[in-house]
Amino acid sequence: IPLSENPGFAKANNLALQQATGEFILFLNPDTIVAEDTFRQCISFFEQQYDVASVGVQMIDGSGTFLPESKRAFPSAAAAFFKLSGIAALFPHSPVFARYNLGHLSLDEIHRVDVLSGAFMMVRKTVLDITGGFDEAFFMYGEDIDLSYRLSKTKKNGTAYANYYLGTV
């Protein structure tokens, strides 16, 4: 989509979302390299689980290091305190002290999580139709937390939807 200016991550993705017609919508950063069968595995998970709002995958950086933003809890004052004070780093696998990055959850398994990264977030279109896309008040950063929150609060025909981290992908 040609744009004369940078409208920000949220607005740019929402412009694309307006033109999207697929059953699943993938928000993907342009510098992301995706393994060959990633999309197939994600779609298969959607088809097997009726309550999936969105899926994210195990993201790694160029040096092979796991990116903790792949799976997160909703931010809180306690999580910020534990991170800024260094307590989370002292106890990286604690469900209390390392709650924000969900350090107690295995990297290589499937988990229901609060927040997925906007760098790779595949979303069921029917759920996006209810929640709307990204909040354009966010120019960059935080918009994935907001959308993850709204997706996790969505209900339709008695189904409560959830966000899933696919550590196997």
Predicted regions and their residues:
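Generic structural signal for small/hydrophobic residues in well-ordered secondary structure
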Residues: 16, 29-30, 55, 64, ...
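A short, conserved alpha-helix in the catalytic core of glycosyltransferases
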Residues: 106-168
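Short aromatic/hydrophobic "clamp" motif used to bind/position activated sugar donors
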Residues: 25
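Short, flexible, basic/aromatic active-site loop/helix in glycosyltransferases
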Residues: 74-113
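Residue-level recognition of short loop/turn positions
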Residues: 21, 31, 63, 126-127, ...
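Hydrophobic/aromatic residue at the end of a short beta strand that borders the catalytic acidic motif
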Residues: 9, 28, 33-38, 61, ...
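Glycine-rich, basic loop-to-helix element that forms the pyrophosphate-binding segment
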Residues: 2-20
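Conserved donor NDP-sugar-binding/catalytic core segment of glycosyltransferases
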Residues: 33-70
